[in-house]
Regions:
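ATP-binding/phosphotransfer module of carbohydrate and carboxylate kinases, centering on a glycine-rich
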Residues: 1-89, 102-103, 126-130, 148-163, ...
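Short beta-strand segments
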Residues: 30, 92-96, 169-175, 179-181
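A short acidic/small-residue loop/turn micro-motif
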Residues: 56-59, 114-115, 193-196
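A charged helix-plus-loop insertion that forms the helical arch/lid used to bind
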Residues: 106-114
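General beta-strand structural signal in soluble alpha/beta enzymes
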Residues: 132-138, 180
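Active-site glycine-centered loops adjacent to acidic/histidine catalytic or metal-binding residues
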Residues: 137, 173, 347
Length: 355
């Protein structure tokens, strides 16, 4: 990608990867699938985040509101006092929706209206006058885990080999998305929609998904599905209802997936039923993916992955049991290193590609 500023020496250095970490900055932008969580980060050319702005909302905003907040945050992170070692060189954007990365267009956000075929790349290029790269948030997070996270080549951890050739990242948040990195490159597929594993049908006649279909993985194993199912079933079970109030400080509507895992370990039968469904249907989905692409690592991120070994150990066992030994023995399921920051770190990582 070339800049509209022309072929300066600085831009030639960008394309040849010869820039020093003090010669400028990149910006990472995160927009969630509902548009209610946005963040903008300023980073140096080593990927170190120097400053971050966030504008979380308690509701699903319209497109104009998101853009206004985005403009505010961009102005905040690019204030002159923050740019003492150069100018902004590139922007990376991680979006929680269907993205045509080749055209820089948001096809749709998964949980918000008004974003259909929105030219976000052009919008940011016009505003900042620098090159911009845009991708799905799971793809960006996958790249971040490979470049600087749990799947990076820097050392050994937990008995698995880092620097794997094929890595699958699975974001288990409000929705479920996947990002596949093969030999250091994100695999986008024919129409840039590879990795939409949340919409794999795993249970016939299962619960309704946000997309309108039934039995999708996202409707069973996403953070939102886990919390909603727990709240919905608890009304018929006073002991479970009391347990929810206890762990949430009497704010039952705020129960998290991690807290449902906690209640399951404490022996709550409703929580155990819900979590067993997560193991079953997420295990089926991952086992099928293992058969198809034979990854070395599966990295779990998002809110559900905050459950840590309460999720990972049983899920690894489930996948192992569903795969032939010769197929499944080489894959390891691990937790994201970047955690809740994976998307914004991924956006920065996008901006640094080929720099």
């Amino acid at each position: 990608m070339t800049s509209s500023r022309g072929g300066t020496e600085l831009e030639r250095q960008i394309t040849t990867g010869k820039l020093l970490a003090t010669q400028g900055y990149v910006i990472g932008v995160e927009i969630s699938g509902s548009g209610s969580r946005q963040s903008v980060a300023l980073a140096d050319l080593n990927g170190n985040i120097l400053y971050k702005a966030r504008r979380p909302l308690e509701y699903v905003p319209d497109t104009q509101t998101v853009l206004l907040l985005l403009d505010e945050m961009l102005a905040e992170v690019t204030a002159p006092e923050r740019l003492r070692d150069g100018r902004i060189l590139r922007v990376g954007v991680a979006v929680g929706g269907l993205v045509d990365s080749s055209q820089g267009v948001v096809r749709t956000l998964h949980h918000a209206q008004g974003w259909d075929n929105f030219p976000l790349q052009d919008y940011l290029v016009e505003k900042l006058d620098v090159p911009c790269i845009i991708d799905n948030n799971a793809n960006a997070a996958a790249l971040a885990e490979v470049e600087s996270g749990a799947a990076s080549p820097s050392g050994e951890e937990g008995g698995h080999k880092k620097g794997e050739r094929i890595v699958l990242y699975v974001g288990l948040g409000r929705g479920i998305g996947g990002g596949l990195v093969a030999n250091g490159k994100v695999y986008h597929g024919t129409t840039c929609t590879a990795g939409e594993i949340g919409h794999m049908q795993v249970k016939e006649h299962g619960p309704r998904c946000s997309c309108g279909a039934f039995g999708h993985l996202e409707a069973i194993a996403s953070a939102q599905a886990i919390s909603r199912t727990m709240i919905g079933l608890s009304v018929e079970y006073p002991e479970t209802e009391a347990a929810i109030l206890r762990v949430t400080g009497a704010r039952a509507e705020r129960i998290t997936a991690e807290q449902v895992f906690q209640l399951a370990t404490e022996g709550d039968p409703i929580a155990q039923r819900i979590i067993e469904d997560v193991y079953t249907y997420l295990g089926i989905a991952l086992a099928n993916i293992v058969y198809l692409i034979n990854p070395g690592l599966i990295v779990l991120g998002g809110q559900v992955a905050l459950a840590g070994e309460l999720l990972i150990a049983p899920l690894q066992a489930r996948v192992d049991s569903l795969c032939l030994p010769v197929v499944g023995q080489s894959v390891r399921i691990i937790q994201s290193k970047h955690g809740s920051e994976a998307n914004i770190v991924g956006a920065v990582t996008l901006a640094l590609q080929d720099v």
